[in-house]
């Protein structure tokens, strides 16, 4: 089989093309836009399906370089930090605690569901944990980390199972989040909270699609340069902040968490000393970074790993989707306040509890693009999905493995 290796330049060029392709398809297929399916997801999945077909026929396999994909992800989260003011941080405090509590409940729920299904089929219950929070709440990184632990506990193919389930979760989380939020918003006739004079909200330019002609703003080159330099400053300092936090606490703080926190400080210092802040320019750059990152991430999915799943795994993953929808629709939405912010956070919760924080942000942004901003959701979801939940997930995974052995 011919193997095609795309370097980081080829990969980012392909991601740009797939974003445009996804935009054309979503414009032509009303069902996709009606249910808030992001354009990068559509374009990326089109390519990953093609890649899967070529791989299955033994023709070729296409591999991506994720170097720039990671950079774009960090840059995007930095722009999210720049949208947050101190009042928004204080307002998001309760939301962060509640969202974290709900997420902690979801972890054993996923694991016991997976383990129970596998036990019913006469399989090792630990295989179900590989289809549970290891892959879903944890995502591909946690799946790669805990897969060998499952194999050490006697589960044959634990790594492959976990990574394949995580791949499924990325797709499912992206597909489920937008439509669920749409249903909640329209059923309860929800609207964004009015913006106070001192508050800030993420602008529509942070949505998944590039700004339309109705979202124009007046700018110039110096303002874009100033915004980009602020981003680079926050990314550089934030990376070191993440290193320090990891060393001090023993927890793993991703680079984008530090960058996001530094961006919050820079933004509020600039506002406090009344220095001009290029809000629209940074928001527009955030839109670009997210769009290309998500297209590249989806294009790189190895969908053929799903084809090789045994029937119990398929049933387990389908049930995980059903339980996730029911839990999000009836529990997350109600606990978080039954308002517009709660609906947006429901989309984000599905994204990171089924896949990754990047999926959560994409889900929320495609919803807020259509219905309006949600500052609380924009701060709470990345903080829970990117900073806190990995620690609790690791502890509960270890406890659940001990339960089934």
PLM regions with names:
Residues 25-41, 53-54, 58, 62, ...:
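Flexible hinge motifs at transmembrane-helix junctions and intramembrane kinks/re-entrant loops
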Residues 1-12, 182-228, 271-275:
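Intrinsically disordered, low-complexity non-transmembrane regions of multi-pass membrane transporters
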Residues 18, 45-52, 65-93, 234, ...:
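Hydrophobic transmembrane alpha-helices of secondary-active transporters
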Residues 20-33, 79-91, 180, 265-279, ...:
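C-terminal ends of transmembrane helices
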